[in-house]
Amino acid sequence: MPNIRKSHPLFKIINDSLIDLPAPSSISSWWNFGSLLGICLAIQILTGLFLAMHYTSDTTTAFQSVTHICRDVNYGWILRYLHANGASMFFICLFLHVGRGLYYGSYVYKETWNVGVILLFAVMATAFMGYVLPWGPMSFWGATVITNLLSAIPYIGTNLVEWIWGGFSVDKGTLTRFFAFHFLLPFIISALVLVHLLFLHETGSNNPTGIPSDSDMIPFHPYYTIKDMLGALAMVLALLMLVLFSPDLLGDPDNYIPANPLNTPPHIKPEWYFLFAYAILRSIPNKLGGVLALVLSILILILMPLLHTSKQRSMMFRPLSQCMFWLLVADLLTLTWIGGQPVEHPFIIIGQLASILYFLLILVLMPITSIVENHLLKW
């Protein structure tokens, strides 16, 4: 009798994806973040579902409903903080996952990489809309400022903004539709994740050396299931430490008062994971230019396969490229810091220099470094 795991149509898919999947024997813990992102998504969907049962998407009661969840609903406080800090864990894993892809040349698998970039945009859109829902001052003014950026689009901009707002300002209509989209997008993300995995399993995983590993593969289970479980345990532990000891560490205290359209906070800033993009946006004095730079700061990832000039796939044996990569990481950390600072000297000029360096590194310095390394190979 054939093994049901290998013959049943449904179990066969699971078996080929998670159990008998051939995986390179040399992949390090940097390859854990895909499964961690899957766990983050599951946590977000589950906690979000239970929060949605008690949340009301009306401007008069939204803030009160969040307070009610934290005070009156059984374990509502832990649901709310798991969801808020789960988003932070999601982005930490996302940034590390993308960074791993850049370092080890995973972008050579174009389809997987491009679906990944679309996923990044979708997660960022979801997180932005979720931040609007508690209806505190940062929620309200963040929604106003970011949606208002679309008015920079020539000809259709103003109409587009009013269409998104559902009126002439951020109001009831905006909150209701943001809640609807915030609920819908995670399921679209789940579908995209399956497409991402579909393309990945067409080629198989990359490995730290960047050399094809077809001759040295091991089954995913038990080796990498155990490894992923260890990573999951570490991440869940970190998340619970954050939620139970300092749940407001990454949030903004300004958001603990109800939104007031008549009173603008002194410093409008997004959650920490958007600060690097916000700094790039602010560093350009022109509205349309800022919006373009903001979009391109993420969209530039799609160009990575075209900008790959090296004869080697991974950066493992390319010390000069490693220097450029870590310079890029340092630059992104600088941008994150600048995004949270007020718009005044010296932060303005630091932000502008860091923004220029960001684009310069990806578009010019890293490809040139790779070409130099190709010539050094001949010595």
From Swiss-Prot:
Protein name: Cytochrome b
Gene Ontology terms: cellular component: mitochondrial inner membrane; respiratory chain complex III
InterPro entries: Cyt_b/b6_C (IPR005798), Cyt_b/b6_C_sf (IPR036150), Cyt_b/b6_N (IPR005797), Cytb/b6-like_sf (IPR027387), Cytochrome_b (IPR030689), Cytochrome_b_C_euk/bac (IPR048260), Cytochrome_b_N_euk/bac (IPR048259), Di-haem_cyt_TM (IPR016174)
Keywords annotated in UniProt: Electron transport, Heme, Iron, Membrane, Metal-binding, Mitochondrion, Mitochondrion inner membrane, Respiratory chain, Transmembrane, Transmembrane helix, Transport, Ubiquinone
Physiological role: Component of the ubiquinol-cytochrome c reductase complex (complex III or cytochrome b-c1 complex) that is part of the mitochondrial respiratory chain. The b-c1 complex mediates electron transfer from ubiquinol to cytochrome c. Contributes to the generation of a proton gradient across the mitochondrial membrane that is then used for ATP synthesis.
Annotated localization: Mitochondrion inner membrane
Species of provenance: Pteropus pumilus
Binding sites annotated in the UniProt record for a ubiquinone: H201
